[in-house]
Amino acid sequence: GYGPGNGGGTGYSLGNRKALNKPQPEYTCQEQGRVAVQVTVDRNGNTISVTAGVQGTTNTAKCLLDQAKIAAQNTKWQADSNAPEKQVGKIIYTFSLN
């Protein structure tokens, strides 16, 4: 990426499961704000679908949504054999210009 800012994760929720590997989104534009991404995760801890720009998002610039989506898709979660087959959670990324 390029630009003076950085993308930082501020939080996530998926029941009581932890994110094992949570890549940071790349910063590719002069935009800042919060992007909330809804994630659907299988019992093995794989993110199987993502929707960027859900409730909690403060900036819907395409460059932020796209990067948040990529980071969310690559997030690996704790496996949980007792979890629902498809568990829905949320990750919130905060993009800020330095």
Q: What role is predicted for each listed range?
A:
Residues 13-14, 30-36, 40-86:
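A short, well-structured alpha-helical segment
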Residues 90-98:
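Short, low-complexity, Pro/Ser/Thr/Gly-rich segments in the mature regions of secreted, periplasmic
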Residues 1-28, 66-74:
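Acidic, low-complexity proline/glycine/alanine-rich linker and hinge segments
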